[in-house]
A protein has these predicted regions:
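A conserved nucleotide-sugar
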Residues: 226-228, 387-419
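Active-site donor-binding acidic/aromatic loop of nucleotide-activated sugar
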Residues: 256-258, 409, 425-435, 453-454
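Short Ser/Thr-rich beta->loop micro-motif in glycosyltransferases that lines
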Residues: 281, 451-457, 475
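Donor-sugar nucleotide-binding helix/loop cap in glycosyltransferases
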Residues: 450, 464
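Short alpha-helix at the nucleotide-sugar/activated-sugar donor binding site of glycosyltransferases
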Residues: 465-466, 489
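Alpha-helical solenoid repeat scaffolds of the TPR/TPR-like class and their adjacent stem/linker regions
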Residues: 1-366, 384, 415, 421-422, ...
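Short acidic/histidine- and often glycine-rich active-site loop of Leloir-type glycosyltransferases
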Residues: 481-492
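Short hydrophobic beta-strand element within catalytic cores of glycosyltransferases
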Residues: 470-479
């Protein structure tokens, strides 16, 4: 900037201040004809990404500009941060990762660089490295609510922290959440003995999402059973879709709260006389923990969207089932546990018209294992175990993810398998498909599904079973590591539940060797699933209706003076 004339400096300052980025881009481009200074290169990059609208070409050009600026002047740290940010948006962060690591190796700590590196590791599926960087930010007392939530959510993907550690982290985060002054919060408006108990449902996923697949039919049962159901939707702007419209037709009332501040949401929920408020988000994206920290409803229940403890003392209950959380395991959760007698969730019935094809192994002469789980769930232990299976079997592995699928991530996964002795031709990546029926038909390429651990699959396991593909699962110690256990138990498929990694490997070997039995299972599994609790929405809904009435009755008896 100091190399410019005083008039040019004032012009650029004015353009930046008034957000005239198109004109700024023109001015900087003309100056660069004389001298490609790092400052001007970075400024041109900023002008390109600040324009409205910003094109893909602008983003790609800015990426090159930020990189050139930083490599010319390693003291221009803003250029590095800008380069990292745009590289994440464009999924081109291999070089940015190396530059951030190099920068941080010379500097004890830097918030922006550490955060960018954590995000890159997350998108590459390096969850332990992601957690290391998140933890550095937390230890330096620079973690905001969004980062804390991301950290807590990510701990579910690895064995890095115990459940005891996790609960301690939750407690620390809870202490940082804003507790509103009672003077500005409206008093509870609920009726103790209402004709209809009013149930509130908070979620950021009332759209085409796994959460909707599990709650839609249950909501209909609750509605029929004399409950009033009210939605508090935190769907991000533009995310509403046909599923949203369908859900709106089920709820008695619907409130979009994504642009409403937490205090006003708390008061809104109290105004609406909500008796029981469900959190369907937990620490997932779009959460609003302050709403529950400030006790928006007299009873608050965590269910479906986040299957671990919230760690909030204000959260009264967590819904699980008899298989997921044994009574002797209650100490792992701050909430009281509501145990549904069969299964914690039931999936809506999928179309029976989707054909189940012949077992691929019959034609292929080898076993095709598969996992359609989020690639972030492919922990180091999972890849190590799957590699041993692939070494010991005439087999291949099909992978597909509905989120965070890009070439750098695939390459990283292949490299992890290669370190475990498995070459790339053994690993087959399938493309993400938008059409749901087409997605389900891809299970016709798989003989046996392999579950991930410690974070097990839920939606993917329901879908796999529907398509006649059984899932080998490893039972863990906490809620979200036992999805496969509960699902298989409800189908009496104990043969597919492994007690440890060696047992998991042995089961894969034995089950894949019996082609005839596997073929029989394939054609009988859908009917078995249809007639099980997995898809019995009515039974689950009625059980929940009864439990909620009991919980409200108990609360009313214990709080007569409220």
């Amino acid at each position: 900037m100091k190399d410019l004339s005083e008039a040019k400096q004032e012009l650029i300052k004015s353009l930046v201040k008034n957000k005239k980025f198109h004109q700024l881009e023109f001015e900087v481009n003309s100056l660069l004809l004389e001298k490609r200074s790092p400052f001007l290169l970075n400024l041109l990059g900023v002008s390109k990404i600040s324009k409205v609208p910003t094109s893909k070409e602008d983003l790609n050009e800015s990426l090159d500009l930020f990189k050139e600026a930083y490599l010319k002047d390693r003291t221009l740290i803003d250029a590095l941060f800008n380069y990292a940010e745009i590289s994440i948006r464009l999924l081109k962060y291999d070089e940015a990762k190396d530059l951030l690591i190099e920068y941080l190796s010379k500097k004890k700590y830097d918030y922006k660089a550490t955060l960018a590196l954590a995000r890159i590791h997350f998108y590459l599926g390096n969850m332990n490295d992601c957690l290391i960087n998140y933890k550095k930010i937390i230890d330096n007392n620079e973690a905001n609510s969004k980062l804390w939530s991301a950290f807590l959510f990510t701990t579910n993907y690895t064995y890095k922290y115990s459940q005891k550690d996790y609960l301690n982290f939750c407690k620390k985060y809870s202490e940082k959440l804003e507790k509103f002054d009672e003077k500005i919060i409206k008093k509870f408006q609920y009726e103790k003995n209402p004709k209809k108990i009013r149930l509130g449902f908070f979620s950021a996923d009332l759209r085409t999402h796994s959460v909707a697949k599990f709650i839609e039919e249950t909501l209909k049962i609750l509605k029929k059973d004399n409950y009033e159901i009210i939605a508090f939707s935190n769907n991000k702007l533009g995310a509403d879709d046909l599923t949203t419209e369908r859900l709106k037709g089920i709820f008695h009332e619907w409130y979009d709260i994504v642009k409403v501040n937490d205090l006003d949401v708390v008061n809104l929920i109290r105004d609406k006389k909500i008796n029981i408020l469900f959190d369907l988000t937990g620490y997932s994206t779009g959460n609003r923990c302050e709403i529950f920290k400030n006790k928006s409803a007299p009873l608050q229940i965590s269910w479906c969207g986040y299957c671990n403890s919230s760690g909030l003392k204000e959260m009264d209950y967590l819904i699980a089932d008899e298989n997921l959380i044994k009574k002797e395991e209650d100490f792992n959760y701050t909430e009281k546990i509501i145990r549904l007698p069969k299964i914690w969730n039931s999936h809506y019935l999928i179309s029976s018209e989707i054909k189940i094809n012949e077992l691929p192994a019959i034609k292929n002469k080898y076993t095709t294992f598969g996992s359609f789980n989020n690639y972030g769930k492919l922990s180091d232990e999972t890849i190590e175990t799957w590699s041993l299976i692939l070494k010991n079997n005439n087999s291949k592995l099909v992978l597909k993810s509905s989120v965070h699928d890009h070439q750098l991530l695939r390459d990283n996964i292949k490299n992890k398998f290669k370190k475990n002795g498995i070459e790339g031709e053994k690993i087959i990546f399938m493309e993400r498909l938008k059409n749901y029926d087409d997605h389900l038909k891809m299970y016709n390429n798989i003989d046996i599904s392999l579950d991930t651990f410690p974070f097990a699959g839920a939606t993917t396991t329901f879908e796999s079973l529907w398509m006649g593909v059984p899932t080998i699962t490893l039972s863990g110690e906490i809620f979200n590591s036992k999805f496969g256990l509960s699902i298989n138990k409800n189908l009496n498929l104990d043969t597919f539940i492994a007690k440890d990694k060696n047992d998991y490997i042995e089961k894969a070997k034995i089950i894949s060797s019996d082609i005839n039995k596997l073929s029989q299972i394939r054609y009988s599994l859908r009917n078995l699933a249809i007639n099980s609790p997995l898809f019995d929405n009515k039974d689950l809904g009625l059980e929940l209706c009864k439990i909620l009435k009991d919980k409200w009755r108990l609360f009313s008896q214990q709080n007569k003076n409220l």
